[in-house]
Amino acid sequence: MSSEILSVAVFVPLPGQEEQALSTVRELSGVLAAGGYSRDVLYRGPDEYVLVRFWKSDECRRAAMENPSAQKCWAKLAHEIRILKVHESLEEIQL
C-alpha cells in the first residue's frame, strides 16, 4: 500500500468565478508540486469539480500549510469556490 495520503475536495466555483478559480487551483497545484508536498488531479463532473490530492506524507501536508505561496492561494480560493465536501484523509483498503 502507498504511504501517500489521499485527500479529496468537491467544490463548485462561485458565480462568475470559474475561470479565476481554476487558475488559482492550477497555481496552488504548481506551488505544492514544486515544493515536493503533493501531486494533484482535477476532475470535472456535470455540476462540480473534484480535486484529488496525493500528499507525499503527513509531514509534507503540515509543511505545505506553512508555505506563504500556498497560503495565498488558499486565501484566494476562499473567495472563488464553495466547497461541498472534503475528505482530509482516505485510507487505502487492500483488494
Q: Which ranges hold each PLM region?
A:
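Short strand-connecting beta-turns/loops that link adjacent beta-strands
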Residues: 2, 45-48
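Short structural boundary motif marking the start of a folded domain
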Residues: 3-7
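Short, surface-exposed ligand-recognition loops at beta-strand->loop->(often short) alpha-helix junctions
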Residues: 10-23
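Feature marks short, surface-exposed loop/turn motifs that line or immediately flank catalytic pockets
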Residues: 15, 46, 58-59
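An amphipathic, aromatic/His-enriched active-site/gating alpha helix that lines ligand/cofactor pockets
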Residues: 27-39, 54-88
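Short beta-strand
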Residues: 40-44
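Short, low-order "capping/linker" segments at domain edges
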Residues: 90-95
